[in-house]
Amino acid sequence: MTPTVNAKTVTRNVGWSVLSKTGTFGLKFVTVPILARILSPEEFGAVAVALTVVQFLAMIGGAGLTSALVIQQHEEMETVHSVFWANLAIALMMALGLFVFAEPLATLLGAPEAAYLLRIMSLLIPLQLGGDVAYSLLVRRMNFRKDAVWSMISESLGAVIAVLLALLGFGIWSLLAQLFVSALVRLSGLYAVSRYAPRFVFSLQRVLALSRFSFGMMGSEIANFITFQSPMVVISRYLGLSDAGAYSAANRFASIPNQVVLSAVMGVLFPTFGQMMHDRERRSQALMLSTQVTTVLLAPMMFGLWALAEPAMLVLFGSQWAYAWPVLGLLALSKGILTPCSTFIPYLKGVGQGAVLFWWALIRAVATTGAVAYGAIDGSLVEAMIWLCIVNAVTLVGYSWVVFRADSTPFLKGLFISSRPMIAALLMALVVRFLLEHFGAHVPNAVLQLIAGTAIGSVIYTVLILLTERSLLRRLLDMARARKPRAAPAGAAE
């Protein structure tokens, strides 16, 4: 039975999800720079290209069926078992197809030397899809604590093994080991905590009934995947594996704040918005509050990383990657521009706006791929990233219009309120960048530049938020006070 959604359950589950992603953040904050210092850009690029294909096929294989399970009114085990077997059959076919056609696919992506990686990594597809049903059951039950624990365990073991193998000289195999260890541990953990045991029960009719919703979700997820992963494919094909490796390393690090906040919040918001589907007022309030809070948290991290990209790249990745600091900065900037859109995907999914989500995701995918390709074909990696920033700025306006129109919220009002923390973060970053460029020479140590810039930026941003977001802060304070247990009346125990 799906639990009742209220502020307490949402806050608790967001807390567990954030804890899980924070653990992952800490690991990647340490392991990505270590691996980058040991491995070459070409090795990073080869694995990143192969992983893009695997993730794409795994996403198609799921066909959105498990997302449909999440919003079903009742947990019918015949339907659950049917989805499991459908997922497994599709996963095995996908893995076999990737194994057979690895060479032409790798050549198409501009990385023919990565064909053997595609064959090995094809085994990841059934490992990933095999746990989707167990995970969807935890999401339905709003039980994110158990998932959080196993996420941290799987990521920790994978990261530790990757670093150890890299230090022992295993090179690219250390990255493969990280992927397989994390996938196997997470798969085992999901089945252990969900207590789901597949049975030989299958109903094609039930699978087809779910597909009416799932195909719309799958289409939008494919388009979103293309949006996020097409830059890697374009860069690999037109600029080579070295630039693809630089992009991959920078993108891994720049994506850490998103993974901490967005992955955690989005997983909880999807079922939450789903249960508020027919309550327009609560749904609208939840949309605006969650959007403001995620923007307040994410925007300073993204714009701050843009401002301090040069010393950050040198300190974290070492001198062999120092040339790629503009890529890190522009990637952080491109992600910072989209921070007000952080809650839009789970909102549209949760309220059943699958068609709207699909068409907008498709438009965004085409625009992003075209912009990055335009910058890469006749330019450089930096030019491609500049065009990514431009298309994301246009996306911010368009996406906001789509969502606020679906929510019946005035567009300009919604855009202003949701983007206000982002503007404050941008102003903070401009000041920090100005100080670094004009006074950075007086602090020759990159570590000290990073510390000083972070401290100055934190003070500036805090002041700006206190000045511009007082109503939001008061509301959060009132919510925190309301969650405190009230004292029992004097005669309650008599």
Swiss-Prot record:
Pathway: Glycan metabolism; exopolysaccharide biosynthesis
Signal sequence coordinates: none
Gene Ontology CC: plasma membrane
Keyword Transport: no
Keyword line: Cell membrane, Exopolysaccharide synthesis, Membrane, Plasmid, Transmembrane, Transmembrane helix
Membrane spanning residue stretches: 16-36, 44-64, 82-102, 105-125, 157-177, 215-235, 253-273, 297-317, 321-341, 343-363, 384-404, 421-441, 447-467
Biological processes annotated in GO: polysaccharide biosynthetic process
Keyword Transferase: no
Domain of life according to the entry: Bacteria
Membrane topology annotation: Multi-pass membrane protein
Chief subcellular location: membrane
Location(s), subcellular: Cell membrane
UniProt record similarity statement: Belongs to the polysaccharide synthase family.
Protein name as catalogued: Succinoglycan biosynthesis transport protein ExoT
Gene source species: Rhizobium meliloti (strain 1021) (Ensifer meliloti)
Name of encoding gene: exoT
